[in-house]
Amino acid sequence: MLYDIVIIGAGITGSMLARELSRYELKVAVLDKENDIANGATMANSAIVHTGYDPVDGTLKAELNVKGARKYPKICEDLHCHIKNTGAFVVACSEEEEKLLDVLAERAVCREIPHEFLSGDDAHAVEPNLSDNITKVLSFPTTSVIYPWEVAIACM
């Protein structure tokens, strides 16, 4: 059989690509070296839907992290997959590290990513298991986690 498109890899990226291409009248095949969907990097990743505050300005990663994070709640709703809004803390234990938090906050402002600074005490009130050495926290309340294998399987 001849195919219009062959996708190499049945992880979350290949599966999502196959789902998008299924909207068109194309013959699409998905190939993977593993014996099942999402058995490679997808199975072993952190499952965090990154909001996009970390990548350097002007990079494709910065652009796509922000766009993807904003799309994921709808994607998971459409696919009937779980998504959990956990939020994320980036912590500082010194003045030098606090300066790095300021850089991340500037990126978040430019990218319109919700964030807020917390004192070490305020952060401990939310998460008591944090180190006592924490002086400042940058909170990203819209950070979420998914089950990547669930999303990959739902796409197929």
Where are these regions (language model features)?
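Short hydrophobic/aromatic beta-strand or adjacent loop that forms the aromatic wall/cage
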Residues: A88, T135-V137
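Dinucleotide-binding Rossmann-like beta1-alpha1 core, especially the glycine-rich loop
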Residues: A47-V126
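Aromatic/hydrophobic pocket-lining residues that form π-stacking "cages" and hydrophobic walls in ligand
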Residues: L17, Y72, L104, A154-C155
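Helical element adjacent to the flavin cofactor pocket in flavoenzyme catalytic cores
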Residues: L138-M156
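The feature captures the short pre-catalytic strand/loop hairpin that immediately precedes
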Residues: D132
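N-terminal Rossmann-like FAD-binding beta1-loop-alpha1 element of flavoenzymes
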Residues: Y3-V30
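Glycine-rich FAD pyrophosphate-binding loop
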Residues: S22-A44
